[in-house]
């Protein structure tokens, strides 16, 4: 099933192929809205650094801070303000997918999963550190990464 609108370009298409795409996800029954940014290095011969700003991502809800999580490496990249640059170095023909989670009130936030590139639409519900996957995804389970956000500081929740 379709869970979101098609990806949109973040920046004007100037080079060989577009390199920055964004897909916003809203309307999830148990998660606040987020967006996924895809970075693509179409160059066949060289690595390339690609960057973007959260403020430029279409459909991303406004916030004072965003948690960034990279799907392939399953790494928390940090907390960024809307105007901060988020940069990744991509090998030739490589791509990266980054989930941006708006951070508002203090608490625990789901910032990433390892099961789906949407980083959340495979999740039916979240309670504390427990995420339940949708019936159509089973028998697979998702490894979820949570961020504890308090006093303007974020740290990955180490779990029990």
Range-by-range predicted roles:
Residues 1-128:
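Carbohydrate-binding surfaces of carbohydrate-active enzymes
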Residues 110-152:
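Mature N-terminal, pre-catalytic/accessory segment of carbohydrate-active enzymes
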Residues 140, 159-160:
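Interfaces that engage single-stranded nucleic acids at replication/repair/recombination sites
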